[in-house]
Regions:
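Canonical AAA+ ATPase core
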Residues: 1-88, 137-139
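Solvent-exposed alpha-helical segments within well-ordered globular domains of core cellular machineries
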Residues: 16-18, 34-38, 42, 52-60, ...
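Generic structural motif
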Residues: 49-51, 93, 172
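Conserved AAA+ ATPase small/helical "lid" subdomain
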Residues: 68-110, 114-129
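C-terminal engagement/docking regions of AAA+ P-loop ATPases
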Residues: 107-192
Length: 192
């Protein structure tokens, strides 16, 4: 639901939001607060299109005729898929692996990652653990498996955590990225 003032409005189910983010360096853009960023399940970096893709984009835009879009999946199919994903099995060892990854963003010194302590200004919140578990289940679902593996967790960790970790000035001066931090955590922690 959405609440405006004292009035609440129910939202349809499923309710999905996809958003784009412009670089902060562009005029008129401002960074979202961490609490708002934390509400997004994933942050996927797309980069620029290839030259041929951009040529197609340019031609379609200039011709004034955009392709008719049709739904590739129905709302009912999304709801049904969500039900399947919720039932995907996650072993307690995988749950603890997820918690170790997230806790390593908060307390790196407790995970043989002491040097990261001066690089991370804040780590992932409990929403990060929940998001990592959900995304790992989705990854398993897309691979037609009824259970989560450590590889599922590792595959989605950068997209789930990159916007949930704050870098210190020291890390920024060294041109470290949150991807570097996540990679170091994944490469250091014991995989179950």
């Amino acid at each position: 639901q959405v609440t405006i003032g004292e009035e609440s409005y129910p939202l349809p189910k499923p309710f999905l939001v996809m958003a784009t983010q412009n670089p902060v360096e562009q005029e008129g853009t401002y960074p979202l607060p961490e609490a708002q960023m934390d509400r997004f399940l994933l942050k996927v970096n797309l980069g620029y299109p290839t030259k041929s893709d951009e040529l197609n984009i340019m031609r379609k835009q200039m011709s004034g005729t955009l392709e008719e879009l049709s739904a590739v999946v129905s709302l009912e199919q999304i709801v049904r898929a969500r039900g399947f994903i919720e039932r995907i099995y996650m072993d307690e060892k995988i749950e603890n692996y997820i918690l170790d990854i997230v806790f390593a963003t908060r307390e790196p010194q407790n995970y043989q990652l002491g040097p990261l302590r001066n690089k991370i200004s804040f780590g992932a919140s409990p929403r990060g653990s929940i998001a990592l578990a959900k995304a790992a289940k989705c990854h398993a679902f897309l691979r037609h498996r009824g259970f989560v593996t450590p590889d599922d967790v590792r595959a989605v960790a950068p997209a789930v955590l990159r916007h949930r970790i704050g870098l210190t000035y020291e890390a920024e001066a060294e041109e470290l990225s949150t991807e570097n931090i996540v990679t170091e955590i994944l490469n250091t922690l014991m995989v179950p």
